Amino acid sequence: MARRDYDPATAPPDDRPAVKARAFDTAGPRAWRGSLAGEAIGSANTILAYATDTIGEGPRLHVHPYDESFVVIMGHARFFIGDEVIDAAAGDVLLAPAGQPHRFENAGPGRLQTIDIHHSPRWIQTDLD
């Protein structure tokens, strides 16, 4: 089904050039890990690739002054966002609202791979534990 959400004549194209940058290496069987600050490519979002093969492992409890979205690419995770505990699997997308403490861990079995989208041109974080 075709989408026609706006009239392109009412919103002129952005004059920025297309940009390509590498956030992580995909060669070999190892987990994808890396990041790319949005400001490096003129974007409003910073992208992180996170992965672990260890059950129970994940980022420590932390908070940002902006929203963070998570896309589970592979495996199963348990997210702790504010007072919520949310189980997620490959294909799920989650949101940690600005100012809400959050963390996640590999719920297994196998590898957990996520793409984490910081809705900021740079990564700003305070660890809470």
Predicted regions and their residues:
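Conserved short histidine dyad/triad with adjacent acidic residue
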Residues: R33-G34, L48-H64
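Short beta-strand His + acidic residue motifs that chelate non-heme Fe in jelly-roll/DSBH
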Residues: L61, F79-F80, A96, H102-G108
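Well-ordered beta-strand scaffold positions
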Residues: T46, H76, E84-I86
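A short, N-terminal "cap"/entry segment at the start of jelly-roll beta-barrel domains
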Residues: M1-N45, D127-D129
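Short histidine-centered beta-strand/loop micro-motifs
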Residues: G38-E39, G58-H64, E105-A107, T126-D127
